[in-house]
């Protein structure tokens, strides 16, 4: 029997090809969202609607399974702790607290301070910040708000 290299190959010779690589994950931006413990929509919705090259990363802040002014205020330090758990070895470009009522109750300054504590260097925002900027851009003058909360 002939050595392996002397046998004719059953496979055609392949061409040498230069691989093409994409730009990598999150080449446009890495965005972090801080969610309530019981949140059920933001993470999947943001991942579904994110443009190509934008990575969506989420962490949940602990909170009682009842939304009230007291439970929202109580989660303040949990916001920064949760932000620190998102990609701890990589810099986020943007970090967002994804709770409109929580941002109003806690206050944007305190929310942003917590986001900065957990994700220093990331641009901070919240859902209410986005809403206010959108209303300003639309020059909205009369606004009606409906919420599912009793207090």
Model regions and ranges:
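Glycine/small-residue-rich loop that forms an oxyanion/phosphate-binding "nest" at active or ligand-binding sites
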Residues: 79-127
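Conserved beta-alpha
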Residues: 111-118, 122-151
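Residue-level preference for short coil/turn positions at secondary-structure junctions
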Residues: 27-29, 91, 120, 139
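Short glycine-enriched loops at secondary-structure junctions
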Residues: 39, 51, 100-102, 128-131
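N-terminal glycine-rich anion-binding loop in soluble enzyme alpha/beta folds
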Residues: 2-81
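Gly/Ser/Thr-rich loops at beta-strand to alpha-helix junctions
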Residues: 35-40, 99-107, 148-151
């Amino acid at each position: 029997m002939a050595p392996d290299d002397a046998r004719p190959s059953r496979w055609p010779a392949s061409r040498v090809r230069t691989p093409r690589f994409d730009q990598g994950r999150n080449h446009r931006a890495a965005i972090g969202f801080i969610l309530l413990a019981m949140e059920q929509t933001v993470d999947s919705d943001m991942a579904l609607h994110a443009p190509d090259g934008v990575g969506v990363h989420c962490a949940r802040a602990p909170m009682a399974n009842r939304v009230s002014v007291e439970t929202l205020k109580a989660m303040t330090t949990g916001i920064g702790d949760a932000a620190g758990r998102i990609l701890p070895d990589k810099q986020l470009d943007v970090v967002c607290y994804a709770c409109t009522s929580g941002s109003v109750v806690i206050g944007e300054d305190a929310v942003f301070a917590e986001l900065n504590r957990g994700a220093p260097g990331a641009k901070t925002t919240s859902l209410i910040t986005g809403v206010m900027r959108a209303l300003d851009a639309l020059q909205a003058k009369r606004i009606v708000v409906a919420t599912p909360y009793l207090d």
